[in-house]
């Protein structure tokens, strides 16, 4: 069985930034990106009875040059984890970009910033969908420290497409 190289993106355990939303990101790089092979790999994943749902978005004909897979896995305690698996064309615009962002965040993140990010994540209503990079940019770049400040920051910095920020 051929297995494409995968890079765990968030590395949330290393930076200790996981709070409430059980979400793990992986980037899988191949050249060429074979849509059928991607579906075959996900079919194997779907055979695991702990995988409860899988979604797919084809972005091959965009600047992102990828396929987004989102799977929900139920752990032994009954908690659902979201696994975001982004299958990316090697050599495309975003090849390695998000891994570099994660490395830069790790390099500049202080304990005080980490705690501020965790506090904001904790205070975020469960119904609110916010990308991790929004928290990181608000805290690291703009010094946001309270949830009301964060709400205002988000109003002034709406997300449109891919967030291309790097500390």
Regions found by a protein language model. Give the residues of each.
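Conserved catalytic core of two-metal-ion nucleotidyltransferases
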Residues: 49-89
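Short, solvent-exposed loop/turn elements at beta->coil junctions and helix N-caps
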Residues: 11-17, 56-61
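Short, flexible loop/turn elements at secondary-structure junctions
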Residues: 14, 28-32, 75, 89
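Catalytic cores of NTP-dependent nucleotidyl/adenyl transfer enzymes across multiple folds
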Residues: 82-167
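Single conserved hydrophobic/aromatic residue that forms the stacking wall/gate
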Residues: 2-9, 13
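Catalytic metal-binding acidic patch
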Residues: 19-42
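Short, charged/polar surface micro-motifs in flexible loops or helix N-caps
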Residues: 32-36, 78-79, 90-93
């Amino acid at each position: 069985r051929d297995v494409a190289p995968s890079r765990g993106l968030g590395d949330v355990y290393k930076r200790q930034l996981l709070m409430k939303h059980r979400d793990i990101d992986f980037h899988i790089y191949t050249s060429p990106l074979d849509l059928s092979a991607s579906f075959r790999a996900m079919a194997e994943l779907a055979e695991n009875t702990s995988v409860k749902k899988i979604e797919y978005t084809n972005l091959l004909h965009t600047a992102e040059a990828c396929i987004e897979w989102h799977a929900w896995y139920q752990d032994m305690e009954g908690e659902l984890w979201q696994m975001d698996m982004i299958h990316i064309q090697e050599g495309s615009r975003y090849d390695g970009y998000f891994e570099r962002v994660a490395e830069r965040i790790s390099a500049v993140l202080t304990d005080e910033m980490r705690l501020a990010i965790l506090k904001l994540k904790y205070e975020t209503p469960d119904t609110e969908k916010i990308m991790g990079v929004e928290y990181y940019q608000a805290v690291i770049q703009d010094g946001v420290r309270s949830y009301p400040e964060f709400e205002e920051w988000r109003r002034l910095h709406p997300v449109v497409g891919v967030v291309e920020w790097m500390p």
